[in-house]
């Protein structure tokens, strides 16, 4: 299995600044009475810290114990607190049905095979209340041709899914969504907006309808 602990031990705080949309989302969440937020794939805590500072009750969930240790250190240094859990996103989340008002997941859920991505989305739906928000970012449209032969040496394992054979994320699946695919996998949500961010990821803001 991919070794996220190894990546975080080598690179430490891989991301520090929050995603550009998070500040705007925090305002939206406050306006609509969002209180509990799940940061799925929270990594070293950049959104845990920001959203906690904004006054939300935030839970972080990640598969890397090293990342969670760094996240807790960050929170302690900022004199903040958040609930964190270690686990794999394709397995049942440690939260009851309808527990969260919102789920954010930045550059995370695409790191899997499609059957596991669908399992993750089912769990997101389960722990999110009806009327709750999701904000998800994923790569889309497929890798550029040069990515197939550069230092990543991508190998296609199923439709839309590639695994780097070398480089820092060697062995980690990367699923590239199409817009139609995103609409289908989030069919139980009303999509409010879709746009491309400055890292060339597709951002999906949606509300759970069913």
Predicted feature locations:
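A short His-aromatic
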Residues: 110-112
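Class I SAM-dependent methyltransferase core
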Residues: 39
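A short beta-strand submotif of the Rossmann-like class I SAM-dependent methyltransferase core
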Residues: 105-108
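A short acidic, Gly/Pro-enriched loop at the edge of an enzyme's catalytic core
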Residues: 90-102
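Conserved catalytic-core motifs of eukaryotic protein kinase domains, centered on the activation segment
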Residues: 114-116
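A short glycine-rich, Lys/Arg-flanked "PGG" loop and its adjoining helix->strand segment in the class I
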Residues: 118-130
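Class I (Rossmann-like) S-adenosyl-L-methionine-dependent methyltransferase catalytic domain
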Residues: 1-34, 43-92, 119, 133-210
């Amino acid at each position: 299995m991919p070794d996220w602990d190894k990546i975080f031990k080598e690179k430490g705080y891989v991301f520090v600044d929050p995603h550009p949309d998070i500040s705007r989302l925090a305002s939206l969440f406050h306006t609509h009475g969002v209180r509990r937020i799940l940061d799925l794939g929270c990594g070293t805590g950049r959104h845990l810290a920001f959203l906690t500072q904004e006054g939300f009750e935030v839970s972080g969930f990640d598969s890397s114990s090293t990342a969670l240790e760094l996240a807790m250190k960050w929170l302690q240094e900022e004199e903040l607190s958040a609930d964190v859990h270690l686990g794999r996103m394709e397995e049942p989340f440690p939260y009851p049905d309808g527990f969260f008002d919102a789920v954010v997941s930045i550059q995370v859920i695409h790191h899997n095979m499609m059957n596991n991505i669908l399992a993750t989305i089912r769990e997101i739906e389960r722990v999110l209340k009806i009327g709750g928000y999701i904000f998800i970012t994923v790569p889309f449209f497929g890798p550029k041709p040069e990515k197939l032969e550069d230092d990543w040496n991508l190998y296609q394992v199923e439709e839309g899914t590639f695994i780097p054979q070398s480089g820092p994320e060697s062995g980690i699946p990367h699923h590239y969504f199409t817009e139609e695919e995103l609409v289908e996998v989030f069919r139980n949500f009303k999509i409010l907006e879709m746009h491309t961010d400055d890292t060339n990821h597709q951002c999906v803001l949606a509300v759970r309808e069913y």
